[in-house]
């Protein structure tokens, strides 16, 4: 489960963390998509953990909040084009949550559950994004990551986003 913005982080703290992330990237001469991770202690102090110089699996949450297609932008940059977005003009709008859907058996320690998908019904609609590469008839192997989809929901508020995610997950039928 991924969620943004984090309800435990104030706007001021989020701004300071963002400024620290930008300074870290600039100090390293980094000019592409990346993720800076921090650890937050109980007193609200944050500490640098790592910077991931890649598009992470959770990137759709950021895309839903900003309206920016991060993968498209990274391809453009790799092709020699200039970045179209200034950091100071990127704003979060609303709230986003991502759930990973696994072909795994929760009653058996989340062991992979390989086989053929015989039923694939996934709701769609405004504020709902499904990232997947499977459909009914797809074979799920035990030799690969059991993640078969990501469900990402967006809405104006955290409560309404949670409601949208719950409705979407309740409407899914995968066998």
Regions found by a protein language model. Give the residues of each.
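ATP-dependent carboxylate activation and anion-phosphoryl transfer catalytic cores
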Residues: 1-175
């Amino acid at each position: 489960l991924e969620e943004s913005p984090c309800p435990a982080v104030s706007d001021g703290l989020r701004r300071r963390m963002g400024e620290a992330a930008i300074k870290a990237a600039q100090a390293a001469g980094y000019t592409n998509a990346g993720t800076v991770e921090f650890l937050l202690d109980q007193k609200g102090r944050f500490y640098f953990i790592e910077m991931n110089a890649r598009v992470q699996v959770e990137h759709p949450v950021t895309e839903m909040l900003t309206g920016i297609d991060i993968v498209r932008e990274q391809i453009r940059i790799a092709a020699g084009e200039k970045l179209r977005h200034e950091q100071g003009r990127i704003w979060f709008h609303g709230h986003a949550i991502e759930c990973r859907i696994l072909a795994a058996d929760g009653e058996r320690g989340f062991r992979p559950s390989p086989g053929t998908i015989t039923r694939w019904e996934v709701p769609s609609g405004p504020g709902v994004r499904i990232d997947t590469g499977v459909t009914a008839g797809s074979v799920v192997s035990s030799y690969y990551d059991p993640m078969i989809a990501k469900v990402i929901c967006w809405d104006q508020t955290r409560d309404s986003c949670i409601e949208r995610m719950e409705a979407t997950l309740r409407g899914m039928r995968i066998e």
